[in-house]
Amino acid sequence: MSNYWVPLLIVGIGIVGNVLLTTVWGEEHVQSLAVRDTLRIVTYIAAVFPTLFSYIRAEERYKKSEKERRKREALDKMRDLLRAAIVKIFEGEDPETIRANIMIEDGGELIILCSINMEFNHDYNIRLAYGHGCAGMAWKRACEAPMSERWVPVLAPKTQLSTKRLRDEWHLTDEQIGITRHVLWILSVPIFQLAGSETKFLGVLSFDGVRKPLKDVHRLKDHTLHIGCADVAEYFGSMLLENNILN
């Protein structure tokens, strides 16, 4: 209702002006020609205002709808690229046992923006604070590490650890530990934008394994794989910015 008080007020003023111009009572009480001319102008404005207001509102709704449509299309494309990235980066592995997601900051925590192979898992709605979990550590690295190291992935090659170690080393809560027990390994890559000598954090690209280990577990520490992940993360960063997804 708060969005409509201005147009309602203008329409109300127009009604009053029309009454003063067209009734005997109005002619008796408003005899000044200047005032009556002003009232005519006001009533004309009030008459066209609802149409103008409706047009503006419709234009706003259209722009909002278009923005949401472009965002949906961009997210669909990002999911397709996540699927392709799994196949390319982890060539020879079973792609159905590898998940991928992009997390962005929301209210001081990371949330999943889009993902592949994890939509029906309990950890799909997980939220991670700064420095918590593999993705939270990647967030911290993107902001605090030396510039030459900010692109380096954060790796958890074995996540089947004791509750105490997961609390102490990865700063996970008991709830987070419970919903990620099925995860076997995680690799998280910072996504950031270079701005001169500074970086702007955009999000985190993560891959993880479920159901069965990788055929080649040593590949997670391969420098070439890390570079490939960083290149993919950089591309996703450009997509986040070009499609205005973070705003």
List each model region and its residues.
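Intrinsically disordered, low-complexity terminal regulatory regions
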Residues: W25, H29, V35-M118, H122-I126, ...
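Juxtadomain coupling helices with adjacent low-complexity linkers
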Residues: E198-N247
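A short, aliphatic-rich beta-strand micro-motif
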Residues: E175, L184-L194
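Regulatory sensory and allosteric helical modules in signal-transduction proteins
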Residues: L113-R181
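Juxtamembrane "helix exit" motif at the C-terminal ends of alpha-helical transmembrane segments
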Residues: V16-E28
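Terminal peptide-recognition signature
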Residues: I102, A138, T199
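Juxtamembrane interface helix immediately N-terminal to a transmembrane segment
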Residues: M1-G12
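Short hydrophobic/aromatic beta-strand element in the GNAT-like acyltransferase core
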Residues: R99, I186-S188, V204
